[in-house]
Amino acid sequence: MNTLENTIGNTPLVKLQRMGPDNGSEIWVKLEGNNPAGSVKDRAALSMIVQAEKRGEIKPGDVLIEATSGNTGIALAMIAALKGYRMKLLMPDNMSQERRAAMRAYGAELILVTKEQGMEGARDLALEMAERGEGKLLDQFNNPDNPYAHYTTTGPEIWQQTDGCITHFVSSMGTTGTITGVSRFLREQVKAVTIVGLQPEEGSSIPGIRRWPAEYMPGIFNAQLVDQVLDLHQREAENTMRELAVREGIFCGVSSGGAVAGAIRVAQANPGAVVVAIICDRGDRYLSTGVFGEESYSQGAGI
């Protein structure tokens, strides 16, 4: 039977035509905005709920709790609506209005913490709520069902779509579920693939990408699965995001711009490489933030 959850995954992989170095390298991007709730997080959201159901930990009608910066919350709200769960989502109040509206549209209850509390504060409050018995904490940051989704779907799709020719995989790091799961799969293949993670520079803020304090580093992260970590400035991520729209026709979010900025760096340093990056979501979730505003384009940013 073809249900909404069956439409998650098997997203297109397309080659950039006008961006990237002229050194024989190729940059391919996986368009995760094509998932039904609009982001790569659809995969992890489905996995966390389905696997918990299989273990008998949750059943329709239960309350689920999660801390999110946006995309995971939207994806979980969609799956919760589909399967009959009540969803409580905790998020910093500086996240975009589009993301808040999407979560509420799916029927989720949204609980905001301050910008100063940030994702760390949202995670702490989600844990407190679960400990008080207010619902089941899915805990994407420490839940192995998160990277398992990418080990069983995203990684195999990339390998198949590149005919095994991929040489480098580049991914932004938030929960680290995508990079952990994809890397684990690629490590098991017959050829070496270099895994590159991306994080914000010290003092820089990029939605969807985190530079975690040691005490908040996601428990699912395995540093041995990442060969290199690149630091990105917010300006570089935003400029690349705008350039993707103007030059490649790919309308995406800031973290995706960061991923492609990192992929371009990797391609420049490795002539002949086949580099794959993740386009995490769509740009329409960021319109209210002003990153696509006329001022940015009038200043030549990203064009």
Question: Which residues does each predicted region cover?
Answer:
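PLP-dependent amino-acid enzyme catalytic core
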Residues: M1-I303
